[in-house]
Regions:
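A short Gly-Trp-Pro
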Residues: 1-11, 16-141
Length: 141
């Protein structure tokens, strides 16, 4: 991996899909979403530009899912089922990358994660992206 804090190696659980993600703004874009799909998936995501994911292996092992408007495309390993990334609905020129797939990181490394209002998505309401809360991780003593 390149010695750049914004470039992160990643993979799915079984290792069939391996990639390198160049984060758009480091971890400043970290978030959770309240849309019906993300609520069930429970992932923490961070942004990468559309050309910011380079597959090292297994791109052909990815499968995808779309719902509702069909504008966001969610990618998964067809072997282990892990969500690796998605094309964002709010910005089609960006990917959301699953933080849990990034080497050496865990969603629990982030003590506070902004939660964005996906139930009232800006593309539906015409309004700005709205933060509806904060997901907090409090370490046990």
């Amino acid at each position: 991996m390149v010695d750049d804090a914004n470039i992160r190696a990643g993979q799915c659980h079984c290792g069939a899909v391996k990639f390198e993600a160049t984060l758009s703004d480091g971890f400043n874009t970290i978030r959770r979403c309240t849309c019906s799909y993300c609520r069930m998936r429970g992932a923490v995501a961070v942004s990468a530009a559309m050309g910011g994911i380079r597959f090292l292996q297994g791109e052909d092992a990815l499968t995808s899912y779309r719902f509702n408007t069909g504008s966001a495309q969610h990618f998964f390993c067809s072997h282990c089922g892990i969500y690796t990334h998605h094309q964002r609905r709010s910005n089609q020129n960006q990917y959301g990358v699953n933080v849990a797939c990034l080497e050496g990181l865990s969603p629990f490394d982030f003590l506070e994660v902004p939660v964005l209002d996906g139930m009232n998505h800006p593309n539906d309401t015409g309004g700005p992206t709205r933060r509806v809360g904060t997901l907090k991780f409090i370490r046990a003593d």
